[in-house]
Structure formats: structure tokens, C-alpha cells
Amino acid sequence: MKIGILCYPTFGGSGVVATELGKSLSEKGNIVHFISYAQPARLNLISDNLFYHEVSVKNYPLFDFPPYETSLTSKLVEIVKFEKLDLIHVHYAIPHASAAILAKEILKTMGVHIPVITTLHGTDITLVGKDPSCKPVINHSINLSDKVSAVSKSLKDDTKKIFDIKNK
């Protein structure tokens, strides 16, 4: 199976979980593509079935903040098409799940159908998720993901309390 993993590249929990999962999947014969703005800290070996794709963000004078989520979405569309990925697995709701859902919608217009799995890690729900500027996007991304997992039962319960989850 060809799997794209979107994650933060840092030593924080979600980046470590995503990287170790991807490494384990590659050891079992799957082809894994990590997609992020920097190589994940725990990804110290690239092999025949383990790849890293950097998301570069251009600075435009028009924007006060570089449009990372847009660049991430475009990069994901490119990789899904070129590498013929079977699955997208995202770790952390913002910006990874929202970028993957938009990429999925773009790819659908090109005749490419790809499932998105979202793994929730904690602060994406309990901290960022409560912020009114992020909550609708996270809610939408969770509801449009094909499968959703949480790193603990308490996080699953918090997610159900904070968001309007449909059929999950």
C-alpha cells in the first residue's frame, strides 16, 4: 500500500507518533511518503519505501503570513497523483486534516478518489479546537474524514463533547 502521512516534524507527541507509525508501516512492506515543511525529527533513515517530501512556502508581499495550508494542499495533490497513493493519514487536525480534505475534493474533480484518515492527538481538540477561529474548520475536517482515530478514549470523549460529530 502507498500511504501519505502528514504531520508536524517536531519532537512533540503527534510528530513522534506519526513518524514511528510510518517507519513501522514501511518495515512491513508499505511505501510511506511523509509530507511536511521539514523532515520529521525521528525520520533518520530514508529507504526504498520511505520518502520525505518538503512543503515549501513562498513569501508574498501581499500576505502577512505565508499560506502554508495552501502549499500543503497543493503538494499533497501533486504527490497523490504522481506517486499514486492509496491512502492519506493525517496527524493533528489543523492544518493537516483540513488540507487533506481540500486535496481530496480537488483530486475528486480529476477522477482520483482517495480516503483520508485523521488521527487526533490532544491539543488540536482541547485547545486549538475550542478556538472559534478554528472550530468550524476542525469540525468540518473531522466529519469529512473517512475514518477518525484518537490517541486515547478521553480524547475521543472530549471530541464528541466539543464538536458536532456525524456518524463517527
Model-identified regions with their sequence ranges:
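A short, active-site helix/loop in glycosyltransferases that binds the activated sugar's phosphate group
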Residues: L144-K168
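Alpha-helix capping/helix-boundary segments
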Residues: P40, P95-H96, S154-K156
